[in-house]
Amino acid sequence: MDKLNISTFPGCVEKTLEYIKTALKALHVSAADSEALLGSAGEIISAICAADANGSVIVSAEKSGKGCCVQFMHLGALFNPCPKAPDSITQKCMDEISFEFKYGRNVLSVFRRANSDKNIQEVKEMKEIQIR
């Protein structure tokens, strides 16, 4: 099992996503799985930023034989940054989602099985149709 930790500020969404992308590449996560995890990470980091742009977030990416887990830890008041909309990338493309508030930390974990059949392209196309 390989694991990488990133400490960053949620106000730097693009920079944080670049760090996560680099971590997923270093962990040899497939392109399709990386795209889904990055889409989910973008939603989550944006939600954290909207709630507390001045705080910090620790992101951990961990790969096992079964898939990849990305965990977001944010200090502060109870706040679950997981998108609730059923058409969100996180809800549609992640195989497991868990949240806990422990010791003043909001911890959200998303897991995607290796080569999951949950296709991010379908979610992107669905969102484009809704926007029109």
Protein language model annotation of sequence segments:
Residues V29-S56:
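Conserved ATP-binding N-box helix of the HATPase_c
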Residues M1-G39, I129-R132:
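Bergerat-fold GHKL ATPase/HATPase_c domain
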Residues M1-D2, A47-R132:
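Conserved beta-strand-loop-beta-strand hairpin that lines the nucleotide-binding pocket
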